[in-house]
Swiss-Prot record:
<keyword id="KW-0687">Ribonucleoprotein</keyword>
<dbReference type="InterPro" id="IPR026569">
    <property type="entry name" value="Ribosomal_bL28"/>
</dbReference>
<keyword id="KW-0689">Ribosomal protein</keyword>
<comment type="similarity">
    <text>Belongs to the bacterial ribosomal protein bL28 family.</text>
</comment>
<dbReference type="Pfam" id="PF00830">
    <property type="entry name" value="Ribosomal_L28"/>
</dbReference>
<dbReference type="InterPro" id="IPR034704">
    <property type="entry name" value="Ribosomal_bL28/bL31-like_sf"/>
</dbReference>
<dbReference type="GO" id="GO:1990904">
    <property type="term" value="C:ribonucleoprotein complex"/>
</dbReference>
<dbReference type="InterPro" id="IPR037147">
    <property type="entry name" value="Ribosomal_bL28_sf"/>
</dbReference>
<dbReference type="GO" id="GO:0005840">
    <property type="term" value="C:ribosome"/>
</dbReference>
<dbReference type="GO" id="GO:0006412">
    <property type="term" value="P:translation"/>
</dbReference>
<dbReference type="InterPro" id="IPR001383">
    <property type="entry name" value="Ribosomal_bL28_bact-type"/>
</dbReference>
<protein>
    <recommendedName>
        <fullName>Large ribosomal subunit protein bL28</fullName>
    </recommendedName>
</protein>
<dbReference type="GO" id="GO:0003735">
    <property type="term" value="F:structural constituent of ribosome"/>
</dbReference>
Length: 97
């Protein structure tokens, strides 16, 4: 499994450790990933996704999982998240008819 958030696309960054004497050594900055269960009110299902800690706060701020994923850009979503988003869109379209 890659070290990448499924909702925001945040992945590993590379940089330097810099000592007091300005000696630089390469290092990795890994995202704070957590495996979290999100409940969709529209599909009435529970989804387990690997997301970073900031994304969890963003989902809560957006008003829930459904609202967040509908506003999210498809370019940063994983294939699993895109499939969930499409399922939510399809159900909302059927309900609006």
């Amino acid at each position: 499994m890659s070290r990448k958030c499924e909702l925001t696309g945040v992945s590993v960054l590379y940089g330097n450790n810099v000592s007091h004497s300005q000696r630089k050594t390469r290092r990795r900055f890994e995202p704070n990933l957590r495996s979290v269960k999100f409940r969709s009110d529209i599909t009435d299902e529970v989804y387990r996704l690997s997301v970073n800690a900031r994304c969890i706060r963003s989902v809560e701020k957006a008003g829930g999982f459904d609202e967040y994923i509908l506003k999210a850009n498809n370019d940063v979503l994983s294939s699993t998240a895109r499939a969930i988003k499409q399922k939510i869109i399809d159900i909302k379209a059927v309900e609006s008819l």
